Amino acid sequence: MRSAIAAPILFLLVSFFVQECESVGFAPELYCGLENCYDVLEVNREEFDKQKLAKAYRALARKHHPDRVKNKEEKLLAEERFRVIATAYETLKDDEAKTNYDYYLDHPDQRFYNYYQYYRLRAAPKVDLRIVIVGTILIISLFQFLSAKHKFSEAIEYATGVGKFRNMAIKDGIDKGLLEMDRNGKLKKNKGVDNDEVIKQIIIDNLDVTGGYKRESIYDTLAWHTIIFPLTIFRYIKWTALWYWRFAIQKEEYDDDAKLYLIRKYIGVSQMEFDQKYTDEDIDDLFERECWLKRNCATWKAERDAAEQEKMAQSGRYKRYKRYMKNAGTISFVDED
């Protein structure tokens, strides 16, 4: 009697255990469901070869293709089988997917990790990250180039309308025989010659536009700086090592280039900004006051800033600007006052 009761209980326990093992080993919604993808394609995991994989897939795809079945119910079964075969092939032909699947087979207990890897790979875009990076750099570089071109055109249009630059261009054009004056002192309108375009081209050739409105160049784009980045790093390391060797170890005295570097560093400007902003007289003053020493440079900079503030405060234009800003206005780049 006791054995008759124990047998059904044992059967239920074993059945429950088998179901639990199945649920831990394979998840219906992952990969090939409750089947092993290797078994689906009839390939040996230990002797895996992509050429054999492709061959096995083509053979099974032909055998189980839904178009070969006419019966409606059998066609549905064939479609389901064909889907499993295709899923198995897509899983094993991709290196990353195969690695994740092998881990899934070897570590069935790590359910959450296996789910994450499966859906992460499915959700990830099938695009080479290198292509995305290169494409992004090129788009940014194109935008930089076109923006610089537009700003340079704005600067030239502005300069063309300024009397001083226009008169200088007209004089230069007359000297070169590109423009002619009539008896009344006005420019002749020769056939086939656009005087305004000639003047504009002369201004472009002779005007030195710097800063944010300088002429566009590929050498100012992100793409170019990315290309020369290794060389830039090498030069920086070489320069730093040489500086340390000369002035920290050898205790050499600073030459003029080293002094100028320290001055720019303490003022807080780049070499291009320094060349644009400071005259030869300013540089002589900086050297005379030994501004390569940090404390001297700080004193000089404070005096310079105070003098500029006072000069601006006394300027009628600056006062108009302050009143304008007080009234919540904005100021444009071009101001001909």
Swiss-Prot record:
Which residue spans adopt a coiled-coil conformation according to this UniProt entry?
293-323
Biological process GO terms, please? protein folding
Q: Which PROSITE patterns match?
A: DNAJ_1 (PS00636), DNAJ_2 (PS50076)
Question: Is Transmembrane one of the keywords UniProt gives this record?
Answer: yes
Q: Look up the signal peptide feature and give its range.
A: none
Record's bilayer topology term: Multi-pass membrane protein
Location of this chain's protein in the cell: Membrane
User: Does Magnesium appear among the keywords?
Assistant: no
Q: Which domain of life is it from?
A: Eukaryota
Q: Which GO terms describe its cellular component?
A: endoplasmic reticulum membrane
Keywords from UniProt, A to Z, are:
Chaperone, Coiled coil, Membrane, Transmembrane, Transmembrane helix
J domain sequence ranges: 36-105
The record lists the membrane-crossing segments as 4-24, 127-147, 222-242
**PANTHER family assigned:** DNAJ HOMOLOG SUBFAMILY C MEMBER 25
Q: Which family does it belong to?
A: Belongs to the DNAJC25 family.
Q: What is this protein called?
A: DnaJ homolog dnj-2
Gene symbol of the encoding locus: dnj-2
